[in-house]
Curated annotation (Swiss-Prot):
UniProt KW Magnesium keyword: yes
CC per GO annotation: mitochondrion
Catalysis performed (reactions): riboflavin + ATP = FMN + ADP + H(+)
Record-level Gene Ontology MF annotations: ATP binding; metal ion binding; riboflavin kinase activity
Origin species: Kluyveromyces lactis (strain ATCC 8585 / CBS 2359 / DSM 70799 / NBRC 1267 / NRRL Y-1140 / WM37) (Yeast)
The keyword Metal-binding appears for this protein: yes
The protein's name: Riboflavin kinase
Gene: FMN1
Enzyme Commission no: 2.7.1.26
Pathway: Cofactor biosynthesis; FMN biosynthesis; FMN from riboflavin (ATP route): step 1/1
Catalytic site positions: 122 (nucleophile)
Cofactor: Zn(2+); Mg(2+)
Pfam family, one: Flavokinase
Keywords: ATP-binding, Flavoprotein, FMN, Kinase, Magnesium, Metal-binding, Nucleotide-binding, Transferase, Zinc
Amino acid sequence: MTRHCDVSIPDSPEPPFPITTSFVDVIAGFGRGSAELGIPTANVPIDDLPKIVEQLDTGVYFGWCKVRMAKDRDTKVEQRPDGREVQYNNGTLLNDEDLAVLPVVLSVGWNPFYQNKNKTVELHIIHKFSDNFYGAQIKFNFLGYIRPELDYTTKDALIADIHTDIEIAKEKLQLPGYRKLKDTL
């Protein structure tokens, strides 16, 4: 499972980790994670995260996350730049399993394959949700670094690497040094 780009991951977090966020809103991204890659992501405003996140190396990280409903908000529909509509249900369709603390793989960077102009933070929660949760809130931690951000020549290579990232994250999160931080969210 080791690739040339993978970094050595210790058995428990080492500085600057763990980095834990407050609850932040889940916003609509480009819609590529689900539609093009089959790997849905939750997007969050990077400006709402601890300042240290902007200083992190670009690449792939792992940790834990917790989603919660955003109360007292009206549902709404927004339009993506490509014209597709996004329904903000604020997490009202989440079930108890969706609201548990869940493993997450995080991408911090520019997504060179898609030539993004702005740095983003995207979370792939390792869980099958039955519906979207745009407008809900999410709290998460960065516990370790898997690999640097890469540019891909094919979508298939990108998808394969994301699946490997997920397997590495699941394996590392089972180690006691990482597993115990599940309870901090």
